[in-house]
Amino acid sequence: MIIEGPVIKFGDKIDTDIIIPARYLKYTDPQYLAQHAMEPLDPEFYKKASKGVIIVAGKVFGMGSSREQAAIALKAAGVKAVVAESFARIFYRNAINNGLPVITLPNSTKEIDESSYVKIDVETGEILVGNKVLKGKGITGMALEILQAGGIMEYLKKMQTVNRN
């Protein structure tokens, strides 16, 4: 699974309240949530991300309260993947379960510039930035299968169909 796109860069400790502010949690429409993704840091994020971007961030991306809407909002906004030094465990699983690839890369914010265009091999974790290949932590096994299906619901539908035949 190869993903590529331009980078939008954030720092450390981007919590779920920044990814999607609590006042929007009562809404379920992914496109509405997308319009408010990252709003506290960048009110224009939705417009920038709509062309398909890769977020590069620092440590503990997705920390804070558990809210599935964070991954949903990012994906619906046009985020193709998130590369970070580390992720909050619950955000990481929510992202996978919603079909949003998340790649752990030590020193990600030092290795990748805001103006970069990156190409990511999700399975191996290799990230091509210009002429440089960076080695992140790839996604394998069932997590990769869930991503390839488009998320946990699509994966379960696929497995149900396979088991019927």
From Swiss-Prot:
Q: Could you name the domain of life of the organism this protein comes from?
A: Archaea
Question: What reaction(s) does this enzyme catalyze?
Answer: (2R,3S)-3-isopropylmalate = (2S)-2-isopropylmalate
Instruction: Please give the PANTHER family that the UniProt record associates with this protein.
Output: 3-ISOPROPYLMALATE DEHYDRATASE SMALL SUBUNIT 1, 3-ISOPROPYLMALATE DEHYDRATASE SMALL SUBUNIT 2-RELATED-RELATED
Alphabetical keyword list: Amino-acid biosynthesis, Branched-chain amino acid biosynthesis, Leucine biosynthesis, Lyase
UniProt-listed Pfam families: Aconitase_C
Description of how the protein assembles with itself and partners: Heterodimer of LeuC and LeuD.
Q: Which SUPFAM superfamilies match?
A: LeuD/IlvD-like (SSF52016)
The Gene Ontology biological process terms listed for this entry are: L-leucine biosynthetic process
Q: What class of enzyme is it?
A: lyase
Per its UniProt record, what InterPro entries does this chain match? Aconitase/3IPM_dehydase_swvl (IPR015928), AconitaseA/IPMdHydase_ssu_swvl (IPR000573), IPMI_Swivel (IPR033940), LeuD (IPR050075), LeuD_type2/HacB/DmdB (IPR011827)
Q: Which family does it belong to?
A: Belongs to the LeuD family. LeuD type 2 subfamily.
Q: What is this protein called?
A: 3-isopropylmalate dehydratase small subunit
Name the Gene3D superfamilies for this protein.
Aconitase, domain 4 (3.20.19.10)
Molecular function terms from GO: 3-isopropylmalate dehydratase activity
EC number(s) stated in the UniProt entry for this protein? 4.2.1.33
Associated pathway: Amino-acid biosynthesis; L-leucine biosynthesis; L-leucine from 3-methyl-2-oxobutanoate: step 2/4
Physiological role: Catalyzes the isomerization between 2-isopropylmalate and 3-isopropylmalate, via the formation of 2-isopropylmaleate.
Q: Which residues form a coiled coil?
A: none
